[in-house]
């Protein structure tokens, strides 16, 4: 498929962008998910396979955050990486995915909040998220200046990711957020990881971030991370379109 955006018909949207953070919205959205086509934010597995597979090992214990009804976990299994645990805080979609992939016993599905993972420290070799952090940040009014609440929410998730990773474990984030928006979140020394960035997609670029626990951030990356609550402002344009809080933030990436 073309790596342009969601792969299925757009479901009913929340009244406001901040609704993407509410479990009630996702529970309602995923009613009937067991029988519906997978919905893929930022492209399906084939779009970023060449970037992802070199970072995986056949015996890796892999955790997928905010799985939704994406086929990603199953595609990873088919790629030769069988040990995949997927979590979402919508119990509705977790039940649907358990039913859909009941024939694959090494795929596990758990209802869980990504800000408070119920796994022991050092449980996974790889943690992967695709669009989950984007959804948590959709309520932000200004992408250049994330609120202290937004920074705290992302920090909660990333602290948990670092905790459940083994030494030398990898965290992989797939997102629409370019480095000038996302690096400052990932480039924090207390997570104890390094940071690399790549892009993928045809026409519209998406972003692939790789963090490896036990390696260090560069001086330049640490400097960007230090700006987390006071990032540089973008140039003021001579004219602009007024954003609406009713705009479908996630679907707006489609071409």
Curated annotation (Swiss-Prot):
Residues given in the record as S-adenosyl-L-methionine binding sites: 26, 30, 41, 66, 88-89, 113-114, 130
Keyword Methyltransferase in record: yes
PTM-bearing positions, type Phosphotyrosine: 39
Aminoacyl-tRNA synthetase found in the keyword field: no
Position of sequence motif Required for methyltransferase activity: 129-134
Family annotation (SUPFAM superfamilies): S-adenosyl-L-methionine-dependent methyltransferases (SSF53335)
GO BP annotations, alphabetical order: methylation
Catalytic activity: L-lysyl-[protein] + S-adenosyl-L-methionine = N(6)-methyl-L-lysyl-[protein] + S-adenosyl-L-homocysteine + H(+); N(6)-methyl-L-lysyl-[protein] + S-adenosyl-L-methionine = N(6),N(6)-dimethyl-L-lysyl-[protein] + S-adenosyl-L-homocysteine + H(+); N(6),N(6)-dimethyl-L-lysyl-[protein] + S-adenosyl-L-methionine = N(6),N(6),N(6)-trimethyl-L-lysyl-[protein] + S-adenosyl-L-homocysteine + H(+)
GO MF annotation terms: methyltransferase activity; protein-lysine N-methyltransferase activity
Enzyme class: transferase
Record-listed E.C. numbers: 2.1.1.-
Xref: Gene3D superfamilies: Vaccinia Virus protein VP39 (3.40.50.150)
This protein's UniProt keywords: Methyltransferase, Phosphoprotein, S-adenosyl-L-methionine, Transferase
InterPro entries: Lys/N-term_MeTrsfase_sf (IPR051419), Methyltransf_11 (IPR013216), SAM-dependent_MTases_sf (IPR029063)
Pfam families in the cross-refs: Methyltransf_11
Positions in coiled-coil regions: none
Top-level taxon in the UniProt lineage: Eukaryota
Function field: Protein-lysine methyltransferase that efficiently catalyzes three successive methylations on 'Lys-36' in eukaryotic translation elongation factor 1 alpha (EEF1A1 or EEF1A2).
Protein name, entry field: EEF1A lysine methyltransferase 4
Species for this entry: Bos taurus (Bovine)
């Amino acid at each position: 498929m073309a790596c342009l955006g969601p792969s299925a018909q757009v479901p009913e949207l929340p009244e406001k962008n901040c609704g993407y953070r509410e479990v009630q919205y996702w529970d309602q959205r995923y009613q009937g998910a067991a029988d519906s086509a997978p919905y893929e934010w930022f492209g399906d597995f084939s779009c970023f396979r060449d970037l992802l597979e070199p970072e995986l090992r056949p015996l890796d214990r892999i955790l997928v955050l905010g799985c939704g009804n994406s086929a990603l976990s199953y595609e990873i299994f088919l790629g030769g990486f069988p040990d995949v645990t997927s979590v979402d805080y919508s119990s509705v979609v977790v039940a649907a995915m358990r039913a859909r992939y009941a024939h694959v016993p090494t795929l596990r599905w758990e209802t869980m909040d990504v800000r408070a993972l119920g796994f022991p420290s050092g449980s996974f070799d790889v943690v992967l998220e695709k669009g989950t952090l984007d959804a948590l940040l959709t309520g932000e009014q200004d992408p250049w200046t994330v609120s202290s609440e937004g920074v705290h929410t992302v920090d909660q998730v990333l602290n948990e990711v670092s905790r459940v990773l083994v030494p030398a474990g990898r965290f992989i984030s797939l997102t629409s957020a370019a480095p000038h928006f996302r690096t400052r979140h990932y480039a924090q020394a207390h997570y104890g990881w390094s940071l690399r960035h790549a892009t993928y997609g045809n026409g519209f670029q998406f972003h692939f971030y790789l963090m490896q626990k036990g390696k260090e951030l560069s001086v330049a990356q640490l400097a960007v991370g230090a700006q987390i609550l006071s990032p540089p402002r973008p140039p003021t344009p001579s004219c602009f379109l007024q954003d609406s809080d009713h705009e479908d933030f996630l679907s707006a990436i489609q071409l």
